[in-house]
Curated annotation (Swiss-Prot):
It catalyses: pyridoxamine 5'-phosphate + O2 + H2O = pyridoxal 5'-phosphate + H2O2 + NH4(+); pyridoxine 5'-phosphate + O2 = pyridoxal 5'-phosphate + H2O2. InterPro entries: Pyridox_Oxase, Pyridox_Oxase_CS, Pyridox_Oxase_N, Pyridoxamine_oxidase_dimer_C, Split_barrel_FMN-bd. It comes from the Bacteria. This is Pyridoxine/pyridoxamine 5'-phosphate oxidase. Pathway: Cofactor metabolism; pyridoxal 5'-phosphate salvage; pyridoxal 5'-phosphate from pyridoxamine 5'-phosphate: step 1/1; Cofactor metabolism; pyridoxal 5'-phosphate salvage; pyridoxal 5'-phosphate from pyridoxine 5'-phosphate: step 1/1. One of its GO terms (molecular function) is pyridoxamine phosphate oxidase activity. The keyword Oxidoreductase applies. Keywords: Flavoprotein, FMN, Oxidoreductase, Pyridoxine biosynthesis. Its EC number is 1.4.3.5. FMN binds at residues 61-66, 76-77, 82-83, 105, 140-141, 184, 194. Belongs to the pyridoxamine 5'-phosphate oxidase family. Pfam families: PNP_phzG_C (PF10590), PNPOx_N (PF01243). The lineage of its organism: Bacteria, Pseudomonadati, Pseudomonadota, Betaproteobacteria, Burkholderiales.
């Protein structure tokens, strides 16, 4: 049997140098994201979202990024879920994008704010009908009796709202406003390239760049 200690690959696809990195981390993220799209990676918009609750316990889950601009990184969820309760108690989070085919990671840390009602309404209206019904049917992160209970609730919601379910008051968007963004490029011998962007009001771009030891 193969042991876990024997599982490894050597990274050699690319490098990341300060001279080639964009001065603005949002520009650098856009560059890498477009390269992930061009490489036809499966769901390059998936990310891990890590939160910490009032009890100090961390939790993490996979979500989809839905918008990125100079204000931050936007995702949508149930405000009454575990992550929602965590963020209400501690409005800070970390995101991680992992594009293994490109041997890249992007780590993002910052404070969390809710998106506007209009932003949440517009995105909710753009979702497939089944997803909009599901937002009402699922009391996310609560214990349920069975799959049948969930499906019965789905049918009930579909009958009530038809083709136009409104956005539930417990569902909407969050924006992570970053204060640190790290770009990681795998390199041979585990001597990876790591460039960390941190907020810096004195810098022309509002960000400073540091190289971290792997």
């Amino acid at each position: 049997m193969t042991t876990l200690a024997d599982l490894r690959i050597n990274y050699s696809r690319a490098s990341l140098d300060e001279a080639d990195a964009a001065p603005d981390p949002f520009v650098q993220f856009d560059r890498w994201f477009k390269e992930a799209l061009a490489a036809k990676l499966p769901e390059p918009n998936t990310m891990t979202v890590a939160t910490v609750g009032a009890d100090g316990r961390p939790s993490a889950r996979i979500l989809l990024i839905k918008a990125v601009d100079e204000r931050g990184f936007v995702f949508f969820t149930n405000y009454e879920s575990r992550k929602g309760h965590d963020l209400a108690a501690n409005p800070h989070a970390a995101l991680l994008f992992y594009w293994i085919e490109l041997e890249r990671q992007v780590r993002i840390e910052g404070r969390i704010e809710k998106t506007s009602t209009d932003e949440s309404d517009r995105y909710f209206a753009s979702r497939p009908l089944g997803s909009r019904i599901g937002a009402w049917a699922s009391e996310q992160s609560t214990v349920i009796d069975s799959r049948a209970t969930l499906e019965a609730r789905e049918k009930e919601v579909a009958a009530r709202y038809g083709e136009n379910p409104p956005r539930p008051p417990h569902w909407g968007g969050y924006r992570l406003v970053p204060d640190a963004i790290e770009f990681w490029q795998g390199r041979p011998s585990r001597l990876h390239d790591r460039l960390l962007y941190t907020r810096d009001d004195a810098a022309a771009t509002g960000w400073s760049i540091s190289r971290l030891a792997p």
